[in-house]
């Protein structure tokens, strides 16, 4: 991997924000091809649509089933490619376990009675849930799962149980499954997964979970698949934020947590060896604290950011772009605008760029005059 470089903002705003609507603690937006609707994910447990004319409608209400303490809640939604009859959801249940479930989607409505549980991942604390979903072109489902959290004590060591490096648990991982049921199993294990020989369908099953695609992550709050690459914005501990980009054909990558934070050895983590390098990292300086991913701006985004990865930071609310260059590898440039309590940046209808704020706003990013 090439080295990354920080490029200062020019001081001129590259984007401006246009408010599209107000929701209850929105944390993400998803879309479907050839569908003008935006599907707004509310942390409190509801999925709502936002039409071009501003009309809103609730299509799924899980508020009675979802724990919303701290970072818990309804976390992510994804539509499988080429299938308009199903929808996939992650949320934290009443005791905080991370649920990955499927619902039938008909007539622009989700029937809660059709819920089918794929995974229930026990989670010991109310933070570092991850929960982000993404499909690849073959219909395989990727799930970003946090390390289990629990870092509230002063001087506490991150990932105390070293879950992210433990291949017998799904915490601190990117999970990859084929969500189609097979016999008594709720899903299938892709044969190309790195630890597929550990599958319970294999009589010689070992202790490594076959659902694991990659590991060594702290809190992959947002993941994104674009042009055959998986982007992972992994929230750091106390010093560094990192962005990872990996071909989906590259299985079994270890991103290093808690052996290291970003590219730097982490206390008590041992000597880092054979780890997959982040393409970019930035320090906790100037008030920055947590990376918020993130999407690749397409040609129809309506901005000059085409081909760049657009992301932000929770504490500063600043928007940034990451661009690959021949001379420096990856360069970050500030985009001028800010949004308090930024929770996501994603692709909207027609390739537009959409941002959400926990304060309630859903915004479109547009080129500044």
Feature annotation, model-predicted:
Residues 231-237, 242-249, 256-302:
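Extracellular protease catalytic domains of secreted zymogens
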Residues 1-150, 222-240, 287-326, 348-368:
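Acidic, Gly/Ser/Thr-rich repeat motifs that build Ca2+-stabilized beta-propeller blades
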Residues 194, 207-248:
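Acidic, glycine-rich loop-and-beta core segments that form the ion-binding/anion-interacting portion
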Residues 144-170, 241-244:
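Short, conserved, GDST-rich strand-edge loop motifs in beta-rich repeat architectures
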Residues 133, 174, 243:
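Conserved hydrophobic/aromatic pocket- or pore-lining residues that grip, position, or stack substrates
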Residues 145-147, 178, 191, 261:
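Short, small-residue-rich loop/turn micro-motifs
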Residues 6-22, 54-67, 103-124, 165-219, ...:
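Blade-edge beta-strand/turn elements of extracellular beta-propeller
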